[in-house]
From Swiss-Prot:
Role summary: Required for protein translocation and folding in the endoplasmic reticulum (ER). Functions as a nucleotide exchange factor for the ER lumenal chaperone HSPA5.
Gene Ontology BP annotations: protein transport
Keywords in alphabetical order: Endoplasmic reticulum, Glycoprotein, Protein transport, Signal, Translocation, Transport
Family as reported in the entry's similarity comment: Belongs to the SIL1 family.
Any one cellular-component term (Gene Ontology): endoplasmic reticulum lumen
Region of interest (Disordered), residue spans: 102-124
Protein name per its UniProtKB record: Nucleotide exchange factor SIL1
Record: glycosylation sites: N191, N233, N347, N386
Native source species: Xenopus laevis
Organism taxonomic ancestry: Eukaryota, Metazoa, Chordata, Craniata, Vertebrata
Residues making up the signal peptide according to the UniProt record: 1-31
Subcellular location: Endoplasmic reticulum lumen
Top-level division of the source organism's lineage: Eukaryota
Amino acid sequence: MDLYCSFIRISNHVKMSTFILLTLCFYVALSDRSPEYALTKVTEAEDDGNVEAIVENEPDPEDQEIFYPTREWQVVKPGQAVPAGLHMRLNLQTGKNEAKLLEEKEGKDRPKQKRKSSTTSDKYTKKELKEALTKFKEGAEQLSPAEEKDYLQDIKQRFRPIEDLQKAFNDLNINVETDFEIMTKIVNRFNSSSSTTEKVSALYDLEYYVHQVDNAQNLLKLGALQLLINSLNSTDTLLIENSAFVIGSALSSNPKVQIEAFEAGALQKLLVILAADQEVSVKKKTLYALSSMLRQFPYAQQRFMKLGGLQILKNFFKEKNAESLYIRVITLLYDMIMEKMLLYKENNTEQYEQKYQQYNQINLLESITEQGWCPIISDLLRLPENDSREKVLKAVLTLIPLCRAEFLKDCNLLTLLNSLRKEYEGLAAEELRSGEQDGYFSEILSLTISITDKLK
């Protein structure tokens, strides 16, 4: 009986042990399947009640959804696959896991190691490079005429001629239009339309193309330049404004088109618009066209002076709400003055004699002083924009030889120069502290000092 009881007790112990063992196995298997118990490498940190950690998760190919991190904290949904190396925290207020990308200071060591390991394999010594070049040359020299012929034939087979490609496009009903063909369609659209809106739209499209020298000269072949010049006579301000805009873009740094436009009477029409009572937006585009015609074109500058162009520009300073035109006018006059000065310094260019004679007939500086431009220009130093001040300072410095007496009479000018000097001394000092040598503000300060010294 005692033996039987002992057997029963032993059997119960075995059953209990077996049950405990099976329970532990089931628990381990369950925790291994759950992402919440996945092995992680955690660095704990405290941050105002939030528990933060840097986590590197093992990738799980069975995950249905991937977490895409940003620089901001985002909630990590249950079951999402989280990339390695993110900043993780448990938000104690919401009870949810959040993650974001590491800051640069936290993750900068790891990228450095990667860059170091990735670049070492790409380094070659000078000796290795020389040997590679020598072998390359030797290999090229060893090609026989037959091998070279085969090589060229292989190249031809790989790449198709442009004619074949165009034929293929034509077979597919795909027409690759040239700029000339596109411009032809635009001009036809402008010419055939009676709607101002459609005409302005065509001019807008045309202006995009005429910036290129060849396309601008295509206007001559199409007869479109004369069409644009005739549009300057329109009573529609939108048509005038956009026509002048296209003309200005076409004339810019394009001598051939400049000459054609001049001979077609564009200069006179532009001056008429600028002298009339027009909106500032119209005058701005017209002044752009005038500037494009006059630059590097001394014969047009002569005609401009004879037609009273300088006086027309001076009248802008009497108009209301025309401040946006002031600096454009001063910039144009300064450029015209500098063209003549630079020509005298560079007397070794071709056609120098012809240009010298043409520029010598332009008395722009004398006309500026005679027509009372000196105080008008110096007064523009009151403008707040640094770019405007720089352009005015350059003009004032250039005009000192002829405007010196009037500048000295203007007590406000000297006070203004001293104020500008103090302002730009501070700005230039900040540039130097930031390690910038010969910066923008230092240049403006230098101009201010030069003018002040020359007026003493």
